[in-house]
Every structure is written in structure tokens, then in C-alpha cells.
Design a protein with these regions (language model features):
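Conserved SAM-binding strand-loop segment of SAM-dependent methyltransferases
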Residues: 205-219
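Conserved beta-strand signature within the Rossmann-like core of class I S-adenosyl-L-methionine
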Residues: 259-267
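Conserved class I S-adenosyl-L-methionine
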Residues: 159-167
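Conserved SAM-binding loop of SAM-dependent methyltransferases across substrates and taxa
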Residues: 170-181
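A short acidic, Gly/Pro-enriched loop at the edge of an enzyme's catalytic core
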Residues: 219-231
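A short glycine-rich, Lys/Arg-flanked "PGG" loop and its adjoining helix->strand segment in the class I
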Residues: 246-258
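Substrate-binding/catalytic lobe of Class I Rossmann-like enzymes that use SAM or dcSAM, i.e.
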Residues: 267-347
Length: 347
């Protein structure tokens, strides 16, 4: 069977496969999980893109995991060098347009799924980026609060300063900055749902004089002629697109006053790879993970002086596990509202 033959390349960890009433063992040792194949995955799909073929098969329940899904994912994703990928078949997914109109649609497809959906499994602050766990027993809500205030401390804010948040999400960081430091905050987003929720929060807290959020592309901010004492961008760079990185850094440089500070928080990749086709099709259309070296290089090209670099890798692992557990707690609600295939996609 080609499916079994193909899966044998992932033998770094031991697991079993059930197919046509037979059980096969792959790798040596004690099996960590069991892959149940309810329907064969076509050979051409596996050879075209392993991640897309396996991901879509899981969504359809053609493939199920008996045991811990996270362990299974770690097993396969630690062996991505064995994945097949015919780039010529997925040009629209791997090399999408990075124009303003295209990226607006890409952002909307993910962030405009509805505030009710994200509220089910994010913490009350609606922070959708890596948290910061000061203590082992910090809750997700506390860790997200820690993260935002850690960022604000690094920016050395003072009352009366102006703060720009590029890709401000639901506005939590700007609101906290205004409340604690009395700064004037301005945020931009391409998500109508985020903008709507952000506006509601600002009005509820009576912060209209200090915080403003607009539905606008960061590339249009320079034309407004304003500059800021501080700029922050959290979890937005991943949506910019590799061809736009130079423009993004140049834009930040233009928008920052002389002597100002820019804090950039993002998910980094080990290298400049094009990414995972399944993730780019279903979760983050147009999403790309920049490497640290390319962003640092671009920063110096735009006359930034890099004074601090910090990896939050271990914190992101904990953040993801918190989100996963929260999602599992409301999974039945998600299935009732959006169907099982959608829920399995988000598993």
C-alpha cells in the first residue's frame, strides 16, 4: 500500500497505523499514538503536498488520531524535511498577491470570523499573541496582562507621549497604555470585527480623548503626515508578506520621531522558507514567518539601532496550550455553530 510506504519515512518516532483492518507499526519502540485511516489519501495528493493532504484528510475525518493529537503533530512536524511539496501546483497559496486589496481580504478571512468565536477561547482581553508567564501558575489572562505591561515598560512611556500600534487587534494594549501612562494612542487594523470591538471598549471606558482606532492600512499612514514618539506592533508582521518587509520597516522609520522607540513582537521562523501550505490555505492566508536575521538586517537598513532582542519561545508554547485547552472546552459549541470540519480545522 502506497500510504503505508509513504508514512514509513516518518520513522523518527514510533506510531501505529490502522488501514483496511490491518495494523502497521512505524518506527522503533513503544507507539506514541495511532493513526486511523478511514479512507485512502490519493497518491498524487500526498506527493503534491504532505501538509495539505494530511491536514485536509484530518478535517474530513478520513484520518483520525487515537491518542494525543499534539504528540502526533510534534512527531510529523519535527520531520518536515520528509514532506513532499510541488510548489508549481500551489503558486496561488504559496505566492499570493501582497497588494493592499489582497491583504485586506486575507486579514478579513481570519480575523472577521466573528468576535463571538474568538471570545470563546481567548482570554477576556482578547489578546491573540504570545503571552508572558512570569510565574508557573499564571492564568492565561494574567499572562496576557503581563505581556502587554512588559511591552509598555520596554517602551519607556511617559504621560503625553504619542503611541502608534500597527495592527492593534481589539485595542487592549492601547487602552492599557492610556490608563497607566496617560499616552495618546492611535491604532490601525484591517479587521472590521476588531475595529468594532475596539471602538466599543474605548467608549465604555470613556477613553475617546486618549485612544483612537481606525480601519486603515499601515501603508497609508505616512500620507497623514503624523509622527509618533513610540511605535509598537504585536503579531502583525506575519501578515505583511516577504516582499513588503522593506516597505514595512521603512514606513515605521518614517512614522517614528527622531529619538523614538519601535517595539516589534512577532513569530519568527528559523529561515526564510515559504511556509506550510495547509496553514496558508486555511488558517493564515498570505501568512509568512520572517526570520530574525532578515528583520534585524532590514532594521539597520532603515537606520534603526537594535538595542534589545528577546525570544519568548517557551512562553508561546504555554500560550498555545492554553488556547488549545480553552478551545477543547467549547468545541461542542463551535461544532454546533460552524460544523465539525471547521472545528477539526482549528484543532
Amino acid at each position: 500500500n502506497f500510504m503505508i510506504h509513504y508514512l514509513r519515512r516518518f520513522d523518527k518516532h514510533c506510531f501505529t497505523v490502522q488501514l483496511h483492518d490491518k495494523t502497521y507499526t512505524i518506527g522503533e519502540g513503544q507507539p506514541l499514538f495511532n493513526v486511523i485511516i478511514n479512507k485512502d489519501i490519493p497518491k498524487k495528493e500526498l506527493l503534491a503536498s504532505t501538509s495539505l493532504a494530511l491536514g485536509e484528510a484530518y478535517m474530513r475525518k478520513d484520518v483520525e488520531i487515537q491518542g494525543d493529537l499534539f504528540t502526533a503533530l510534534r512527531c510529523f512536524l519535527s520531520q518536515t524535511g520528509q514532506f513532499s511539496l510541488d510548489k508549481s501546483l500551489f503558486k496561488r497559496i504559496l505566492y499570493p498577491s501582497e497588494s493592499k486589496s489582497a491583504q485586506k481580504k486575507q486579514v478579513s478571512s481570519h480575523y472577521d470570523l466573528g468576535n463571538d468565536f474568538y471570545a470563546k477561547w481567548l482570554d477576556p482581553s482578547m489578546s491573540y499573541s504570545c503571552a508572558y508567564f512570569k510565574n508557573e501558575d499564571d492564568s492565561l489572562e494574567q499572562a496576557q496582562h503581563n505581556k502587554v505591561h512588559y511591552i509598555l515598560e520596554k517602551l519607556y512611556l511617559k504621560e503625553g507621549m504619542t503611541l502608534l500600534d500597527i495592527g492593534c487587534g481589539w485595542g487592549y494594549l492601547l487602552i492599557e497604555a492610556a490608563k497607566k501612562y496617560g499616552v495618546k494612542g492611535y491604532g490601525c487594523t484591517l479587521s472590521k470585527e476588531q475595529w468594532k470591538k475596539g471602538q466599543e471598549r474605548i467608549e465604555k471606558l470613556g477613553l475617546q480623548d486618549l485612544v483612537q482606532i481606525d480601519l486603515v492600512d499601515y501603508r497609508d499612514l505616512v500620507a497623514e503626515g503624523r509622527q509618533y514618539d513610540r511605535i509598537v506592533s504585536v503579531g502583525m508582521l506575519e501578515h505583511v508578506g516577504r516582499s513588503n518587509y522593506p516597505l514595512y520597516m521603512e514606513t515605521a522609520s518614517h512614522l517614528l520621531k527622531d529619538g523614538g522607540m519601535f517595539l516589534l513582537h512577532y513569530i519568527s521562523g528559523h529561515d526564510e522558507s515559504i511556509g506550510n501550505p495547509w496553514m496558508r490555505k486555511y488558517i493564515f492566508p498570505g501568512g509568512t514567518l520572517p526570520s530574525l536575521r532578515e528583520i534585524v538586517s532590514l532594521a539597520y537598513d532603515d537606520e534603526f539601532q537594535v538595542i534589545d532582542v528577546e525570544s519568548l519561545r517557551r512562553h508561546y508554547y504555554k500560550t498555545l496550550m492554553c488556547w488549545f485547552n480553552n478551545f477543547q472546552n467549547v468545541r461542542d459549541e463551535v461544532i454546533a455553530a460552524r460544523g465539525e470540519e471547521f472545528a477539526r480545522m482549528w484543532d
